[in-house]
Amino acid sequence: MSAVNRAAVEAVLRQYTDPYLNQDPISAGCLRSIDIQGDRVSVQLELGYAAGLFKSGWAQMLQMAIEGLEGVTSAKVDISTVIAAHKAQAQIPGLANVKNVVAVASGKGGVGKSTTAANLALALAREGARVGILDADIYGPSQGIMFGIPEGTRPKIKDQKWFVPIESHGVEVMSMAFLTDDNTPMVWRGPMVSGALLQLVTQTAWSDLDYLVIDMPPGTGDIQLTLAQKVPVAGAVIVTTPQDLALLDARKGVEMFRKVNIPVLGVVENMAVHICSNCGHAEHLFGEGGGEKLASQYGVELLASLPLSMLIREQADGGKPTVIAEPDSQIAMVYQELARHVGARIVLQEAATPAMPNITVSDD
């Protein structure tokens, strides 16, 4: 039996593609060490995105492949996760205790943006990340309801300055709804709304988050511009439906984020298909393939396509979104895929950003 060497192990690893980074572990820069002791091989990999529900199966697949090498009787692959801080706007200082800010936005209301934001935050937490969600939809805050936080709940104040977020389902939650009467409408002009958003972002005592998901109000107005100019966003997720009108407004959202140099991580298509609960007939009530066309048009990824489902609505309204209510369901698995893709896209966006040139000034 011939002895195994490092090159042979690396060759095996290069044959397997991480489905979220779209690269093999070595090309993606995930390899940390290869230790060969006779016929035993130990490999250490490190992922830069939350993948708690994925990495054990991934490690087992790679381990079996390495054990297929001649000269190897046993192999062990350990995969750890280290989530780094990323931001698109270099000139904006980072938020205290927040590594990555993800904006969830839509061009128009009624497309399931808030439900997507809630399930994304919960899915990231299930993958092992430390997560918070900020309800920036100041005119129509709904995250308190979706996270099952009782009406009238108020955040504690720390050091007479900081709002302490309310924890629910393992996610830290902050919303303007916690500071106002639920029955009182927010009749505010743009500058007041923008100021309130900044106060919520900068004066909430988040506890060392890997990801802060911001549920944006629909449209392309003052709050979106404030976010781009004042908050260090890592990337945006655009939520739409296949309907032509929704896609038209979603395009405006994509264009807006691009103009302010915030990368669009991808598109989520809600209400893609309705499946009859009685006969199982599938019907595209709002059109077909709209999210895919939008993603293709702008060269971004279709991160998820979700059906029109009464359960998604009922579970969110009941304070336990699908990821919590039915964690093993097919729809919950789509949200987990979404979470892993979002985390991986942030890593890939950072890698694709060109470095600033080194400028040397001399007297020669």
PLM-predicted stretches and their roles:
Residues 1-32:
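N-proximal, solvent-exposed amphipathic alpha-helical segments enriched in charged/polar residues
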Residues 27-30, 35, 47-105, 339, ...:
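Extreme N-terminal, non-catalytic leader segments
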Residues 60, 206, 210-211, 217-318:
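Conserved catalytic-core segment of NTP-binding enzymes
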Residues 101-138, 254:
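Walker A/P-loop phosphate-binding motif and the immediately C-terminal alpha-helix
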Residues 124-188, 194:
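Phosphate-binding loop that captures ATP/GTP phosphates
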Residues 155-157, 176-191, 200-224:
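Switch II (G3) loop of P-loop NTPases
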Residues 174, 216, 229, 337:
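Glycine-rich phosphate-binding loops of nucleotide-dependent enzymes
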Residues 318-329:
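C-terminal boundary of histidine-terminating zinc-finger modules
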